[in-house]
Swiss-Prot record:
Gene Ontology annotations for the cellular component aspect, listed alphabetically: centriole; cytoplasm; nucleus
Gene name tied to this protein: SAK
Top-level EC class: transferase
SUPFAM superfamilies the UniProt entry points to: Polo-box domain, Protein kinase-like (PK-like)
Protein's organism: Drosophila willistoni
UniProt domain Protein kinase: residue ranges: 14-268
Sequence ranges assigned to domain POLO box in this UniProt record: 675-755
One Pfam family recorded for the sequence: Pkinase
Domain of life (superkingdom): Eukaryota
Entry protein name: Serine/threonine-protein kinase PLK4
Cryptic POLO box 1 (CPB1) domain residues: 386-505
GO biological process: centriole replication; male meiotic nuclear division; positive regulation of protein catabolic process; regulation of centriole replication; regulation of protein stability; sperm axoneme assembly; syncytial blastoderm mitotic cell cycle
Active site: D139 (proton acceptor)
Quaternary assembly: Homodimer.
């Protein structure tokens, strides 16, 4: 049992002094015990707030875990009690406050590698103690590491800690501080003790560099970098420091170095000679004596829902806990946003604000988090130009060539991966827009060339970026990533955002499930599913609302309906499966020749039950075991012409028996409206231009869009995979999402068709011969594509 006899069991037995910190559910005060005259920190948790949000059991969970612990590197919980209004936790007082605040305000510069090794040794010793008892902390950060009077590091704040039943047990909860959260936690994959190892890597990087490895101006971009494990290793670090950081920040948790190996790493030899040796030894029989039984009721495994404080004059760690995916959780997430607003939960902090878990879909909080208090230094720190950009080097590996025009710039990704930005200004003397500035960035983001073509005049806008100028001066126009002047950072950020957008639309893994075709994009966050029934599941960046569309392309507003629940359940399963596939292939790719790549990759195939035997090409060998067909249509051929439609409606007999001028004109028009151009566009489908100006695109998923010129009435016709054809008279914003997605490919299609050669006369004749002269509804013709 806890040695509580020396500490008071009521608040009256303490002399409460000044406030140390305040949050949404609790306040922390410095106090002195009237019995022992010892200074302590008392956290007062408002019972009304935790009962109102169903977080009572989570408070007990934190108390249960923390009260069992006693180790030199763990902040001690002396005792706890309650009255009618509050739950009181009597904690060890850390006189020198948070490590984060000490580094930024007292030192105003990073730690030396020797001091960082000393701090790391104490933190690792404390984590080894926790892990030996199957306790996962899940929120190791500089704000949760406190400094005692003798400058010993103490692990604090067990609000997110969880008790594992066995060392290999996995959890699915997304929680923690964004700058220190692991990729598997962000991706909502199963995670275990290795998540704390990742946080140790972020901690070491922050100690020796002065800022977290994945720090950005916004929570969302930070999480994106964490998922991609993109960080910059400064050149001034020693080889030992770089090696240990890289081993700690392995994206695959199974590849990370163990905590025992950290203590034996050569970097730890930099530790100061007078540093205290590790006091952890799990092999000693008495080691478990410190792991004492908790008072009170045992509770189910789950997160604490409170904000904890335990440092001198510290600000709150301000984290919003996610709900465990367990039936034992009984919190009411709908009430949390109201409490956050009423009690000032989102307070500015010099450290990255925690990521609000999926309890609210309001993106306003994201904007607040991304706009304040995310600098790695305090306001008193001097921000020099030598500091690096808050965006990692871009990377265009596997991205296809593309070109996109905005009002003021034209952005391109070339075939060899180079990114080109052409900035456009209107020249009144020439009465046209001209390219006045050009920024070229290598595919790995390391080399940047900036120049002005034909100064004063600029270049005319062309279909392709202009070639690099041969007369560019060396150090005035050519930079590397680390030496890029701050005046050009916006250009680089502009390019990085463009590459990020392209990644969010470029499939990395295509997976055919039993119900849908799934695309996991290159950024490892965006995920889309096109159900074979016509429905759609769209998952984008963390914090943005999941979007579901029914078979008719209408957005589902009620995500609690049975249809939406089934789609969400299947979507989450497929997303996790694609992430696991990606991790496995990346592991195989790392062990193989670096010149070989596994991506993009297609896994599985569309179920054969969706394709009837009669829909297959006779005499053709289906190399992918799958044939897609467009649904039944009243159009006798792939050509969308009014004469063909009329011919279909009247039947073949009416055509053969009528010799009127109108019929002859219809037949003549039908024969004239033949394909004149046809190309196969990778990742899009087969595009055809007809002699009457109609442009048809047969997509690889079996759907089709026909763009009708104004002379023939205008508009477009969209045919779904399930056979439903819809005519839209205008290209307005009311189009269904499926149509808008496909229309986004049309500029590329038209550009490719413009450059495509005309079909030969032999090819035209073959096509005319293959086109049915007439078709009745009882004998439909199917347009088929074999992939």
């Amino acid at each position: 049992m806890l040695p509580v006899r020396n500490y008071g069991e009521t608040i009256e037995e303490y002399e409460v002094q000044h406030l140390l910190g305040k949050g949404g559910f609790a306040s922390v005060y410095k106090a002195r015990c009237r019995r022992t005259y010892q200074d302590v920190a008392i956290k007062m948790i408002d019972k009304k707030l935790i009962h109102g949000t169903g977080l009572s059991s989570r408070v007990r969970q934190e108390v249960e875990i923390h009260s069992r612990l006693k180790h030199p590197s763990v902040l001690q919980l002396y005792t706890f009690f309650q009255d009618a209004n509050y739950v009181y936790l009597v904690l060890e007082l850390a006189h020198n406050g948070e490590l984060h605040r000490y580094m930024n305000q007292q030192m105003s510069h990073p730690f030396t590698e020797a001091d960082a090794a000393t701090i790391l040794q104490q933190v690792v010793a404390g984590l080894l103690y926790l892990h030996s008892h199957n306790i996962m902390h899940r929120d190791i950060s500089l704000s949760n590491l406190l400094l005692s009077k003798d400058m010993h590091v103490k692990i604090a704040d067990f609000g997110l800690a969880t008790q594992l039943k066995r060392p290999d047990e996995k959890h699915m909860t997304m929680c923690g501080t964004p700058n220190f959260i692991s990729p598997e936690v962000v991706s909502r994959l199963s995670h275990g003790l290795a998540a704390d190892v990742w946080s140790v890597g972020c901690l070491l990087y922050t100690l020796v560099v002065g800022r977290p490895p994945f720090d950005t101006d916004a929570v969302q971009s930070t999480l994106n970098k964490v998922v991609m494990s993109e960080f910059i290793m400064p050149t001034h670090l020693s080889f030992e420091a770089c090696d240990l950081i890289e081993k700690l920040l392995k994206k695959n948790p199974h590849e990370r170095i163990s905590l025992e190996q950290v203590l034996r790493h050569p970097f730890m030899s930099k530790r100061s000679a007078g540093a205290e040796e590790p006091q952890y030894n799990s092999s000693k029989p008495g080691a478990c004596d410190f792991y004492m039984e908790a008072q009170g009721q045992s509770v189910a495994s789950g997160d604490s829902g409170i904000v904890t404080f335990a440092s001198n004059e510290s600000r709150s760690s301000q984290r919003l806990r996610s709900i465990e995916k367990s039936a034992q959780s009984s919190s009411n997430p709908q009430m949390l946003p109201q409490i956050q607003e009423e009690y000032g939960y989102w307070q500015p902090s010099t450290e990255h604000k925690p990521y609000p878990m999926p309890l609210s879909s309001d993106n306003a909080e994201w904007e607040r988090l991304g706009s304040k208090g995310n600098q790695p230094h305090t306001a008193a720190s001097v921000i020099t130009e030598e500091q690096q950009m808050r965006v990692p080097p871009l990377n265009t590996i596997r991205l296809q060539p593309t070109r996109y025009k905005t009002k003021n710039a034209i952005m391109s990704i070339l075939r060899h991966g180079e990114v080109v930005l052409e900035f456009v200004k209107f020249r009144s003397k020439l009465n046209e827009d001209r390219v006045t500035d050009i920024c070229r960035i290598s595919g790995d983001g390391r080399r940047i060339i900036i120049y002005q073509p034909d100064p004063g005049r600029g270049l005319p806008i062309r279909e392709q970026p202009p070639p690099p100028e041969s007369h560019i001066a060396g150090d005035k126009s050519v930079y590397n990533y680390d030496s890029l002047p701050s005046k050009h950072w916006k250009k680089y950020l502009y390019a990085a955002r463009f590459v990020g957008l392209v990644k969010s639309k470029t499939p990395k893994i295509t997976y055919f499930s039993s119900l849908a075709k799934c695309h996991l994009m290159e950024n490892m966050i965006d995920f889309e599913m096109s159900y074979y029934s016509g429905a759609k599941y769209v998952k984008t960046s963390p914090g943005e609302e999941l979007k579901l569309y029914n078979n008719y392309g209408m957005l589902l507003s009620d995500l609690a309906c049975p249809e939406a629940k089934k789609m969400i359940e299947h979507g989450n399963e497929c997303f996790s499966h694609c992430i696991n596939i990606c991790n496995a292939l990346e592991l195989a790719q790392q062990s193989a020749d670096s010149r070989n790549t596994c991506f993009p990759v297609t896994i599985g195939r569309r179920p054969l039950t969706d394709v009837s035997h009669s829909q297959r090409f006779d005499g053709l060998r289906d190399t992918t075991n799958i044939a897609y067909s467009t649904p039944k249509s009243h159009q006798g051929s792939i050509n969308f012409s009014m004469s063909t439609i009329s011919s279909v409606q009247n039947g073949s007999e009416s055509v053969s028996s009528t010799h009127s001028h109108a019929s002859r004109a219809q037949i003549q028009a039908s024969q004239q409206n033949v394909p004149i151009k046809r190309i196969n566009i990778p990742d899009v489908g087969i595009a055809t231009e007809l002699s009457h100006g109609i442009v048809q695109v047969q997509f690889y998923d079996g759907s089709m869009i026909s763009l009708i010129p104004e002379i023939q009435g205008g508009g477009l016709t969209y045919t779904q995979c399930n056979g439903v054809s819809t005519y839209f008279p205008k290209y307005d914003g009311d189009l269904p999402l499926a149509v808008r997605d496909r229309l986004a490919q049309i500029p590329q299609v038209k550009l490719r068709l413009k450059c495509a050669p005309l079909l030969s006369n032999h090819r035209k004749a073959d096509n005319i011969a293959m086109t049915p002269k007439s078709t009745t509804p009882s004998t439909p013709c199917y347009n088929r594509i074999v992939l």
